[in-house]
């Protein structure tokens, strides 16, 4: 990696979606709250930990609203902005929605970072929003100890095409749109063990918009969609399992993985979030003998701007794979299936 004048990753205690509060801790925090009102127009709220809130405004239209922000996962300021914006917009796509506009969320140590650097972060976000065809229509800024950037993303979806994370059916096949290993690569970057070509692969996957989402939403054979982010593949798949009342089988050898991820794992490179994720939900995951260590690391690896996870009928698999390929996702893979059983995951 070329030397940066200021290493953004050294200004924060965590980076990317690895900054998320661990699932078990978050549950304890929320348990102490009274809960929100739930109007009938609120089609999706917090019930199944879905990707975005959805509020119906008429028979054909519902608003999709979401927000994501985090601390730097890379040192290049423009790349940081691009990754954060791509990650935020992804939740709209995951619900089957089309993005409309965004608001910027900016927290920066203005006495530490040059204003030009902060401007480059914001420019990266603008670049991605332009690629998505939406404006950044406003936002909010604060002077903070660590660099923080993200978006509020607003979209629109036809309620009939809305895809939740709780609609999977027994017999469905599971399809993952992007490679895993982003958190592992970020750990390697912090240790100065990520070569330029590996960095480019990491940025390429984390800045690719999940544009298949709205098209997938129109397919009757697609029953559930979510995106894989900070809780790792296992965490987000468990949300699908619990919401749908089903059990998933994941074929470990079929998981698409960034080229150096397994090598880095064997060298002990991983994020702290991986361990926190396992502590939060590991009891819901059964890993076959001989796979325990390395599979656990990959399954819990926090993905920043990860791929769409699709649960669809076997008859729809070919169409879904073709759609991903048409949108430029060459690593899309069938990784498992859903079946009747106690909600959880078996890794074989």
From Swiss-Prot:
Entry keywords, A to Z: ATP-binding, Kinase, Magnesium, Metal-binding, Nucleotide-binding, Selenium, Transferase
Catalytic activity: hydrogenselenide + ATP + H2O = selenophosphate + AMP + phosphate + 2 H(+)
Binding site for Mg(2+): 51, 91, 227
Cofactor note: Binds 1 Mg(2+) ion per monomer.
UniProt GO MF annotations: ATP binding; magnesium ion binding; selenide, water dikinase activity
Domain of life: Bacteria
InterPro entries in the record: PurM-like_C_dom, PurM-like_C_sf, PurM-like_N, PurM-like_N_sf, SelD_I, SPS/SelD
Active-site feature positions: 17
Residues at the site labelled Important for catalytic activity: 20
GO biological process, one term: selenocysteine biosynthetic process
Top-level EC class as recorded in UniProt: transferase
Cellular component aspect of the GO annotation: cytoplasm
Protein EC: 2.7.9.3
Amino acids binding ATP: 20, 48-50, 68, 91, 139-141
Pfam families linked to this entry: AIRS (PF00586), AIRS_C (PF02769)
Necessary cofactors: Mg(2+)
Protein purpose: Synthesizes selenophosphate from selenide and ATP.
Family (UniProt): Belongs to the selenophosphate synthase 1 family. Class I subfamily.
Subunit structure: Homodimer.
Protein name: Selenide, water dikinase
Gene: selD
